[in-house]
Regions:
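Alpha/beta-hydrolase superfamily serine-hydrolase fold, recognizing
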Residues: 1-146
Length: 146
């Protein structure tokens, strides 16, 4: 999401110390997203230092570490989000969908029912499942309309 948001938010790109791609991003497909990397949980305890660096580099990007920051959300193209009740990161996807909704952004959320085979990123890890094919077909349709 950061790379896509940087196309429309120069301050974000500057804080990250990168030049945004000129390749236009019309929509995003986000499957079982690890959106929140600074929470006090298994992800947030170790990941931030690898993602954001230390010292001045970290300080410049600090305000953008949470993807539901309004400057990031409002800079995103339409988003198609996929999760499931068995996805260990379902709560991240639902929180991100809530932020998109609160900021009036166009998105579609597909949250699959509780089913042991529909685990984290099931549509990537097991693309031959009926639900995986359904996910990909709906995502393509969403992209075509973006």
């Amino acid at each position: 999401i950061y790379a896509a948001a940087m196309q429309n938010c120069g301050a974000l790109a500057e804080a990250a110390g990168v030049t945004p791609t000129i390749l236009p991003v019309r929509a995003l497909g986000l499957i079982s997203g690890m959106f929140y990397t600074t929470k006090f949980d298994q992800i947030g305890l170790f990941l931030p230092r690898y993602l954001y660096g230390k010292g001045e580099r970290r300080k410049a990007f600090k305000r953008y570490e949470k993807p539901d920051c309004p400057e990031i959300i409002k800079a995103l193209p339409p988003c198609y989000l996929v999760t499931s009740k068995e996805d260990m990161l379902e709560h991240y996807t639902l929180q991100f969908a809530k932020a998109l909704k609160e900021n009036g952004m166009r998105f579609q959320l597909k949250d699959f029912r509780k089913d042991k085979k529909l685990t984290h990123a099931f549509s990537v890890f097991d693309p031959y499942l009926k639900e995986s094919r359904e996910t990909m077909n709906q995502m393509v349709h969403f992209f075509e309309k973006a």
